[in-house]
Amino acid sequence: MRKIVKKLSDLINKMEPTQIMVIGFAIIILIGAILLNMPISTQNGESIGFLDALFTSTSAVCVTGLIAVDTSTYWSFFGQLIIITLIQIGGLGFMTMTTLFALIIKKRINLRERLLIQESLNQIDLSGLVKLTRYILLTTVLIEGTGALLLSTVFIPQFGILKGIWYSIFHAISAFCNAGFDLMGVVSGPFSSLTYYVNNFTITITVSLLIILGGIGFPVILDLIRNKKLSKLNIHSKVVLFTAFVLIGFGMLFILVLEYNNPKTLGQLGFGGKILASLFQSVTLRTAGFNTIDLAAMRENSIFFMIILMFIGASPASTGGGVKTTTIATLILTVKSFILEKQDIEVCERRISETTVKKSLGIFLIGVALFLMGTLIISITDPDFSLLEVGFEVVSAIATVGLSIGGSPNLSILGKIFIMLFMFMGRVGSLTIFMERPDRVIK
């Protein structure tokens, strides 16, 4: 036994931080699948089958939100508890959670563990990582707690004290982690998400704010806390906030115009309801996975536009996915510099390094390649779906969004396996999988 433990320890010590991160996520997914496959996890007391359990666990850990069965009507309280725990671990990153336990038992964080935290949080240097992790954990508790408190003002009167509190906590965590899992199937039918609350200001705005805060990233949140004035924020925070709010505003306007008279989506709502629903849908496209209108009923041009926004996704070091807002911002500035024939690429009078530009281009091209490859594969495994439906499900998986227009529950076995792989790739990061990081190696 000692020899086996020693061999495993030696093997782990030889691994790169990125490799350990990938394996760590895979192990958590496997444990989650085993727990969800137990009869105690379902309401009918029967095992769901390992494939669907694995699909759900992958979606939860990768904070995606694509589901094979309705969360509220199929899973028991135990099953729902497992799912939300997996979401919290996946949203914060397993190294952040590991650091939490290390801090609780007052264990010293060594250099190798700091490298793992650095990789998990996508930070440039090692200084202040443990302190940053503490801030992340405290900020998460504060934001999710406040969100749950606000949601409880609606859910407790509607569902009673115990169920209302549980629903508030579940949806606050799911929203902040940009997961998109919901328990509203008992209210408005399976797979209905938050459509019942399309006109509810409290639910819509609270969930939207949680999604935005989870999507802009912890470094930006901490920068906002430290510096009350926008002018004092660092360059990264300014770029993230500007890009995020431009995309949200543009997305809201686009959805409002295209769906304004669609009787199956915005057409039945008053003007205020149209604005609220358009805003929420634009926000949730930032990799959250909730919806307050029927996505399958949206016009094709709206769905195509949503694919673009989902592909862009959230910001670095956040709970969201996608190729990241900073990647798109960097590429736009690069194109602008090329058109104006400028030698340097600048933002806020600061020069963007060539390494950053290359990394952004690499992430973007890998994202496009995964999307095209995924669309082709799923169109072969599930030929009954249209190309637009396939593309929507694939980008939703790769960008860990979780929005669906009806495809996920009806995928074939092969289709589900490939979608799981795309969710996993989207969560651990395409650069982590495909590119080595020689600058991170400590000799």
Can you name each region flagged by the protein language model?
Residues 1-443:
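Membrane-proximal intracellular helices of multi-pass ion channels
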